[in-house]
Swiss-Prot record:
It comes from the Bacteria. The active site is at 143. GO terms for biological process: L-arginine biosynthetic process. Catalyzes the NADPH-dependent reduction of N-acetyl-5-glutamyl phosphate to yield N-acetyl-L-glutamate 5-semialdehyde. SUPFAM superfamilies: Glyceraldehyde-3-phosphate dehydrogenase-like, C-terminal domain, NAD(P)-binding Rossmann-fold domains. This is N-acetyl-gamma-glutamyl-phosphate reductase. Belongs to the NAGSA dehydrogenase family. Type 1 subfamily. It catalyses: N-acetyl-L-glutamate 5-semialdehyde + phosphate + NADP(+) = N-acetyl-L-glutamyl 5-phosphate + NADPH + H(+).
Amino acid sequence: MIRVGIVGASGYVGLELTRILLKHPEVEKLYLFSDHFEDSWIFESEKIFVSDRSSYTELYKNLDVVFFALGSGETLKFLNDNQIPERFIDMSADFRFKNPGEYERVYGIKHSMPELLEKVVYGLPEVFREKIRDAKYIANPGCYPTASLLGLFPLIKNNLTYGNAIIDAKSGISGAGRKPTDKSIYGNIAENYQAYSILNHRHQPEIENIVKEMGYLRVLFIPQLIPVFRGIFASIYVPLREDITSDELYLLFKEVYKDEYFIKILPPSCSPEIKKVRGTNWAVISAQVDKNTRNAVIFVAIDNLIKGAAGQAVQNMNIMFGYDENLGLDFLPLYP
């Protein structure tokens, strides 16, 4: 049994972590740290200890792992002001780049802990499982990169693609976080659809950096906001090196992900649906070939708050501690 802390427990991701970890059979005690608890009654449980962030200094040595559910730049600031725990899983982008200069270029923040970057593993289990198993520090991937990389990985692994990948990705408004903005308020998002951060979204460099570790591919990434609360749907278009059929591509994806509990591969004629992954740690994928252009057309659907954030973080925790990977994560979708 382990004791787990969550710093930043009152945001959307922190709340999802709390919900999942509260029912996790190997979590003995859950420590929630936040300066913004408004409805503390929802955390009433013998298994939960609730406090503001100031008590972290007294308690961190008692914790086996800490989740940082903070915004980019905030985890760095918190760790500069407090002790580094024995193990952590960071939900921000603060440790996703090995090169501190690249992080500064993308986020406009000078990295204050460059010596720690080489010790942090990028937490995409289906690709980097063995590294995660031996890691003490995990950088949880972004939601868009999770969907995009899971869609591209089988092609890159088998050297079937080259050139430029086009990723056309739609997200629900929870991806913007709990703090309201002009784009996320109901009056502006309802019955609306728009692209944002066009050609300069911060997740594009993250995707490209990890793609370089897998192989090599350039990425054109355009995110869009759709009027749903949770979910990501990524449409990926990428040229193929050789002529293969949709059925052959389907079998290739099935083979690559045959042992992956959370990856569901649909037949070529089917499309994933956001509604059928809500509340799950699944990534549902379909892949087919456009014969006219010899491009692979890949669709990926995930819940941005679960597989794109909290669920994947708990999946990483399970790997770190040698638990069954699906422990505490075996959810059916919130459907209908």
